[in-house]
Amino acid sequence: MTLDALLQSLPPYAKDVRLNFSSLGREETLTAQQRDGLLVACGLASRNPDLARALEAEAAPRLSPAALAAAKAAATVMAMNNVYYRFTHLASNPAYATRPAKLRMSSIGNPGVARADFELWSLAVSAINGCGRCIDAHEQVLREAGVGEEAIQAAVRVAAVVASLAVALESVRAAA
């Protein structure tokens, strides 16, 4: 199903979701690659296959193969890291935070795109997955790279809208 068809399938109570999504395309603080990569990464992080396919179909033609792969890598490696580091952050035993993770994360070190773009995508996925430790780590890297608060907030806004779109689509499916 196309993105337009998914958006048209939203019920009246999801009007804000549809309007918020339409405003994402007018976001001026993000580059086109950042915005399109966010759509792909957040679509995957939403765990809604229909939405993930539609967002990738919408964004992929505007992304290089390397950027598309990096956006997917951000979603997949953050799925792992967000679980692991959220555990180390939330566990009552502080010893877990001092132990080595022993998890491969080579895509973080060599994402194939500008580091700031990959970090924005990772931050947004971390926001969807609710890992405060990862959010703080990615936000710090972005700020050190000179990325402004407006762009960081815009990336999280994309994540929030994609997450709400996934829930709205699930509500349609549940009612069917």
Curated annotation (Swiss-Prot):
Q: Which GO terms describe its molecular function?
A: alkyl hydroperoxide reductase activity; disulfide oxidoreductase activity; hydroperoxide reductase activity; peroxiredoxin activity
Q: Which UniProt keywords apply?
A: Antioxidant, Disulfide bond, Oxidoreductase, Peroxidase, Redox-active center
Q: What is its EC number?
A: 1.11.1.28
The enzyme class is oxidoreductase
Q: Which reaction does it catalyse?
A: N(6)-[(R)-dihydrolipoyl]-L-lysyl-[lipoyl-carrier protein] + a hydroperoxide = N(6)-[(R)-lipoyl]-L-lysyl-[lipoyl-carrier protein] + an alcohol + H2O
The record's InterPro entries line, in alphabetical order, gives:
AhpD (IPR004674), AhpD-like (IPR029032), AhpD_core (IPR004675), CMD-like (IPR003779)
| Pfam families according to UniProt | CMD
Q: Which residues form the active site?
A: C131 (proton donor), C134 (cysteine sulfenic acid (-soh) intermediate)
Q: Name one GO biological process term.
A: cell redox homeostasis
Cystine pairs annotated here are C131-C134
Q: Which HAMAP family match?
A: AhpD (MF_01676)
> What NCBIfam families does the annotation carry?
ahpD (TIGR00777), ahpD_dom (TIGR00778)
Q: Which family does it belong to?
A: Belongs to the AhpD family.
Q: State what this protein does.
A: Antioxidant protein with alkyl hydroperoxidase activity. Required for the reduction of the AhpC active site cysteine residues and for the regeneration of the AhpC enzyme activity.
Annotated protein name in UniProt: Alkyl hydroperoxide reductase AhpD
Its source organism is Methylobacterium sp. (strain 4-46)
Q: Which gene encodes it?
A: ahpD
